[in-house]
Every structure is written in structure tokens, then in C-alpha cells.
Amino acid sequence: LRLRFAPSPTGFLHVGGARTALYNWLLARSSGGSFILRIEDTDLSRSTDEAIQAIMEDLQWLGLNWDEGPEVGGDHWPYRQTGRFALYRDAARRLLSQGKAYRCFCPPEEIEEKRKKALQNRRNPMYDQRCRRISEEEAGRREAAGEPFAMRFRIPEGVTRIKDLIRGEIIFNNAEVGDYVLMRRDGTPTYNLAVVVDDIDMRINHVVRGDDHISNTPKQILLYEALEAEIPAFAHLPMIVGDDGKPLSKRHGDVAVGRFRELGFLPEAMVNFMALLGWSLDDSTTIMDRGTLIDNFSLDRVGSKSAVWDIDKLIWMNGQYIMAMSDEELANHVFPVLVREGLVKEDYQDARHILEKAAPLIRERMKQLNDALPMVSFLFQEVEVEEESLELLQGEDNQRIIKEAGKKLLELDEFEAEAIEAALRSMAEDLALKPRKAFQPVRVAITGSKVSPPLFESIELLGRERTMQRLAHALEIEQESTESAGEES
């Protein structure tokens, strides 16, 4: 099989586009075929190099490597449509010379006005074929005189049948398709011409895309026939919708692949989750690695019913992948997050060792990689005590707890979690306090928060020297607040 993903670089990679790329990639990998990336950048006013780069980075992050396309090359270079305009012009001229296309001299403003009126009257806004009736001789004279024109495809009579691999047979009445534009007045190709010429040239034999393209398919099949080319197999994937049943968009929350990367989702979880947006292995299996997906994916189990985007399920699934990681793997995934947030520098490799030790303490509390930040930040930067936690450092009782904790910890020969726990429990007993009440001021002094990973292990990770510094600083905070209150009075 030869399959392609052909995004328009006018913005971010939408999760719907990523799902389409994934299904094409899985089919290529499961069949030993080729996955081609083609950039459809004919919208010159909106396409940007930055968007192209971002789309490629998102695909690479997801692990959807391409066999032909930008950065890797191939036999059908270039893989950007702006570098292929000569092919489109040649195809349009060939159709024109064969009488399968014609020149349209109608002013765009006039066509737009007719389109608006048709919509107002609830009619299909098709071109009225006025220029179709102009003789070739007259059209040639008007072109030679410099009159601007577009090229339109001459739709034949009859019906067009699509044998969709997911939806079965779909029949279109050609009379309702309309003579559509192939080349605009400015010499740029329209989507339908460019995509067909490219798919023919790149020998694409399976077109797998979203069902929003169904209306384009009869136009393209007729164009394949006019160009005397083999028609590929078509499969139109079900739409992805929000919980309100409407097409997934920004109003439903984050929809850009890059945003999920920033939020700490794993590519493995994203691929697993997106694979299930329309396809299933059976009625029960949910967690599947990439190898399982490749071995089992086929269009036979892709349904036509809309797939619902369930962010809660994605978050749960991401948590399952985090739970399955080794300590080293989790540390290697969290480390770049710390670098990105400025908590550590990239060359501070000891951070990985610290994170590896912290992994067992934080893993069960994590659903996303970013969840690690509030739990481990105290290990890499001086703490800033949360406003709602300050009260646990204030007052004579809390100050006594912190002082006694410092004394007990300072006496330890081995600064390990088990010994730390024994020392702090001894402190609580000496002060006739329940352990929970005695431990909270220490927790806030060490981590800056009432909520943290297990206290004794956290203190061990922080180390004796920094622990004593934190406890001393907690005593200073109380002194500063007392002095401040005195000045105000």
C-alpha cells in the first residue's frame, strides 16, 4: 500500500488530523507499505514555514515517521505543493485541449453574488455553466486578447459511485456536483486538481481521510477518469465530536497535538487513545502498545459512527502508561519538563538521579507528566510557602515542633527514611502530639505545602543539610511575621 497524510500548514496539527495520520501510518506499517507526508501549501496567504515545522515536530513526537516527504526525500520530490505548480498547469492544459475542461471568464464578484443568492433561496450554489457554452474558437480569441479566466472541469452526465472501504457504496448524481474550478485566474491550482495530480504522481493507491472530504470524492474520481489514471481505494473516517455531538473544536478545550505535549501527555498514550477514535480491537481491550496496534489494525473494524472525544479517558489512559514506567523511564520523561519550566538546567544531569529516586513517591499521584512539578519542585529550588500553609509555621506550638524536629534529625547517624520516621515519631511522642498534627508543620517547612509526596522519603531525598536549612528558614519566617506585626501595631 502507498498512503499519504497531506496537511495544510495554515495552523496547528489538530487531533483529528493526527488521528488521520495515525490510521494511514498504521495501515502502511501493518502492510509493509509506504507512508508519505505531503505538504498542501497552495493557500499562499495562510501557509507558513513555522506551521510546517510544527506539524512535522508533532508527527515525530507521536512517532509517526514518514518514508517519503520533507526532510527524508523520495522519488517524487518535491513534497510541497508550491514546488509542483508546473505539474498542475500541465494537467489542466491537457484537460483543456481534450475538451474535458473549459475557460471561465465570469468575474469572481459575479459568481460570488450568484452563490449568495442560491444559498438564500436554499438551492445548491452550483456554477450556471454560462461559459461552458462558449465555443473553443471564441474562448481562444478571448484568452489571446488577455482576458483573465479560470479553468473549470466539464462534469460529464450520469452518476459517480464510490466504493468506500468503511461506508460501502455511495452514489452521487453528477448533475449535482457542478463544473468546479481547476485553476484560478491567478494561475494557482484548486485543492481538487492538486490533490489528484499529486496522488497520481506519487502512486497513492489508498486514500484514507476524514468524512468531511466525502463531497470532494466524486469530483476527484471524475478527474482521475478524465486523466485516464487508476482510481485509488477510498476510506472516509468517522468524524470526531465533543460530548455535545458537535465537531471537535476549540470550544471543547485543547485540540492541538502540541498542546497535549505541553500538558504532559505521553506520545504512547496519545497514539493508543487516538487509535480507538473509530477503531477497536475487540469489545474490551483498551491499553495497546504500538506493536499491538500495527499487528491488528485494519479498516474492517473502523466504524462509520462519530467518535466521541473523551478527555477524562485520555487522562486516565495517560496515567496507566505512567504507572507502567520504570523509575528510570519516568525520570527521563519528567526531566525535560523541569528544564522547560526553568527548575533545572539541561546540563544538571544529577536531577535525573534525584527524579529516579522520587519516582516511586510520585508515580501513583500522576496522570500527566506536569503533575510531577508541584511534587518535586521543592527538591530543586528554595520553597516559597503557600499562603494557606503559613499558619502551620506560626505560633509557639508549631515553632516548638519545628525546633524539636530539627534536633531529632540532627542526631541521626543514617539519614534514611526509616530512621527519619522514627525520629519524627519520637518528637511527636515527646510533645504529646498525634503524629499527623506534629508532621504537618515539618511538611510545610520542607516542601512549602500541606500536600506533598510521603514526608520521610521526601526528607531523605532532600538530604540532611538542606533539610536543616529549610527548618531554620521556617523559624525565620515566624520571626519575620512577628516583627512585621509589631511594626504595624
Regions found by a protein language model. Name each.
Residues 3-9, 37-41, 202-207, 255, ...:
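Glycine- and acidic
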Residues 94, 102-103, 107-236, 241-248, ...:
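Active-site cores that bind ATP or allylic diphosphates and position pyrophosphate for catalysis
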